[in-house]
């Protein structure tokens, strides 16, 4: 890499923004053999900022370990055991039988890891961690500095642009903050990774408004000197077979009425803690720092968090953005927060940012190597990416509602999210294999890798995962939105009519992946839905050399069937309860009229 402040630069690709997504994109295009100009003006604050999105999820780990060359850095990060959701923990000093919980241990059993010869593939596929963003970005910058194809124009920000018509280059005008330096970058393709500045989405009018009244604000901070001893036996969970784990080793989410708290442990005794709130339930004129500390104070388990240990604090009153476009046939693309952000799923957002950037990379590669613009691929990416963000938003939308107090909704809404994550395992394996074996360099492809990339062209989207990859992505998003909404409305009806279901808990693992949902039908007992592990036949284990491993193909289909069965039960049970209530009301009305007639 060369660091440039010259007035005029030219490259195949210009990447705007040198955050984690911008740095990754610069590396992606350099590895595809193209010249890159990376444009940004970094400051001490921007390079040390503790950004959110620390918990790697779905595809993030895969892309960062391979194209990002962060295998060693991530291996040294805080290992993510899984994720753990809880509702009803306010005012309690420990998790107990009145708390609703949903957890998943993402770490694979040793026998599964040992079955794969290429351990780099195992780490790319299943080595999720919790990262300190400025430290990871510093490593990415050092990697970028070694790449001769990348020119880092590090003294200016994009101020204006002229989009080319036809086959010409775009022209991006940049200027330093002190207005002492400026110039122009000419490039065939323009990739906007400017984050919440949203340079292209704002300038070109690609922003989509939300019209459903759901808006969220957020406040978050990173804390130092959090002694690990505070995570004592109160954080322990014992599985049915006797295995003991600690919940704090997961990415922890604590739900309450109209808010969501995340607790993410990091290396060096640091912790990231954030609160997101439904603005309809909290006075939007209140200071979000005050809201943050008020909600944290509701949890005795978090009493170790002190203002004096706060390294950095951020707050934003509006943390939802949506773009109608990811990639344009006019040869520009919008990636990361520049395109869309759905609070509070920042980690999910990073995953979507990197996966859609990879799709755009394939489009750019075809164009710059002479194959021309693949407009059908562009159309599919735009439709599927927008649908993915809608689906992601539906995952969070109703968890802020009163329905979360209903234990069945708590379980079934997370079960629906779990379906998406389970179905993603197959393309996650496929893209991990492609990236690990090619290093992101298409010239290293074999016929098998070409086949993998052809499959991923359609299925590396949340709304195009097998087994629903043949359905239009917008239809999949609408079904997901309606499904979540229906679960919430039935739960709200139960709550409004005095029906209080017993608390429930499900802690799942790769080899104990299906909760005992049948126990929800027995109201006299606590819903302990956690299954015991199953030892599978050795021949079904993933070896790492397959294109579509049978075990991963089965995962999405199995969880789809489980979700459909749970939906049928929820609809039928609630319908029966409605009918019973209606019959009881009518009978009481008849009796009341009879009494009135008798005593008239």
Give each language-model segment a name:
Residues 11-38:
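N-terminal Rossmann-like FAD-binding beta1-loop-alpha1 element of flavoenzymes
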Residues 21, 44, 197:
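Conserved Rossmann-like nucleotide-cofactor binding loop
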Residues 30-52:
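Glycine-rich FAD pyrophosphate-binding loop
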Residues 46-108:
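N-terminal FAD cofactor-binding segment of flavoenzymes
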Residues 121-142, 199, 282-286:
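Short beta-strand to alpha-helix junction loop
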Residues 143-293, 297-300:
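Predominantly flavin-linked oxidoreductase catalytic cores and closely associated redox partners
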Residues 257-259, 265, 276-396:
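FAD/FMN-dependent oxidoreductases across multiple families
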Residues 363-600:
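C-terminal helical "tail/cap" subdomain of flavin- and related membrane-associated enzymes
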């Amino acid at each position: 890499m060369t660091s440039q402040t010259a007035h005029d630069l030219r490259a195949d690709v210009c990447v705007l923004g040198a955050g984690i997504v911008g740095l990754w994109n610069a590396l992606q295009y350099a590895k595809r053999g193209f010249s890159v100009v990376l444009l940004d003006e970094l400051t001490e604050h921007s390079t040390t900022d503790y950004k959110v999105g620390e918990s790697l999820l779905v595809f993030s780990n895969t892309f960062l370990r391979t194209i990002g060359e962060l295998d060693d850095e991530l291996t040294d990060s805080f290992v993510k055991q899984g994720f753990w959701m809880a509702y009803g923990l306010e005012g309690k000093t420990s998790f107990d039988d009145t708390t609703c919980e949903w957890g998943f241990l993402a770490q694979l059993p040793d026998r599964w890891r040992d079955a794969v010869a290429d351990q780099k593939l195992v780490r790319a596929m299943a080595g999720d961690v919790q990262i300190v963003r400025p430290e990871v970005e510093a490593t990415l910058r050092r990697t970028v500095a070694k790449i001769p194809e990348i020119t880092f124009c590090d003294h200016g920000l994009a101020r204006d642009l002229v989009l080319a018509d036809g086959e010409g280059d775009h022209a991006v005008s940049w200027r330093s903050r002190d207005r002492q330096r400026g110039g122009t970058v000419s490039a065939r393709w323009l990739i906007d990774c400017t984050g919440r500045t949203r340079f292209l989405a704002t300038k070109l009018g690609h922003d989509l408004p939300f019209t459903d009244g759901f808006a969220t604000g957020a406040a978050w901070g990173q804390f130092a000197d959090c002694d690990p001893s505070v995570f004592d036996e109160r954080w322990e969970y014992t599985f049915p077979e006797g295995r003991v784990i600690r919940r704090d080793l997961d990415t922890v989410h604590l739900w309450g009425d109209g808010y969501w708290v995340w607790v993410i442990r990091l290396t060096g005794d640091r912790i990231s803690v954030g609160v997101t709130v439904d603005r309809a339930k909290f006075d939007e004129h209140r200071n979000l720092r005050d809201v943050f500390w008020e909600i944290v104070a509701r949890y005795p388990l978090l009493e170790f968090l002190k203002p004096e240990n706060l390294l950095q604090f951020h707050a934003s009153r509006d943390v939802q953005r949506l773009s109608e476009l990811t990639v344009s046939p006019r040869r520009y693309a919008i990636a990361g927060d520049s395109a869309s952000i759905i609070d509070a799923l920042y980690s999910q957002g990073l995953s979507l940012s990197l996966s859609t950037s990879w799709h755009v990379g394939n489009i750019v590669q075809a164009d710059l190597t002479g194959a021309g613009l693949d407009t059908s691929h562009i159309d599919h990416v735009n439709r599927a990416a927008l649908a993915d963000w809608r689906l992601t938003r539906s995952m969070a939308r109703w968890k802020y509602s009163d329905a979360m107090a209903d234990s069945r909704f708590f379980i079934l809404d997370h079960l629906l999210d779990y379906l998406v994550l389970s179905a993603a395992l197959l393309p996650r394996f496929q893209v991990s294999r492609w990236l690990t074996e090619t290093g992101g360099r298409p010239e290293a492809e074999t016929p098998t890798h070409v086949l993998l990339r052809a499959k991923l062209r359609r299925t590396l989207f949340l709304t195009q995962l097998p087994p629903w990859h043949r359905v239009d992505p917008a239809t999949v998003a609408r079904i997901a939105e309606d499904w979540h909404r229906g679960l919430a409305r039935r739960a709200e009806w139960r709550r409004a009519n005095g029906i209080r279901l017993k608390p429930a808990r499900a802690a799942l693992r790769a080899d104990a992946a299906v909760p005992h949902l049948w126990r929800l039908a027995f109201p006299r007992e606590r819903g302990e839905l956690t299954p015991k592990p199953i030892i599978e036949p050795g021949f079904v284990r993933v070896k790492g050399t397959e294109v579509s491993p049978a075990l991963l193909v089965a995962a999405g289909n199995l969880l789809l069937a489980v979700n459909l069965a749970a939906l049928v039960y929820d609809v039928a049970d609630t319908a029966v309860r409605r009918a019973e209530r209606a019959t009881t009301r009518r009978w009481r009305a008849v009796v009341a009229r009879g009494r009135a007639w008798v005593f008239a």
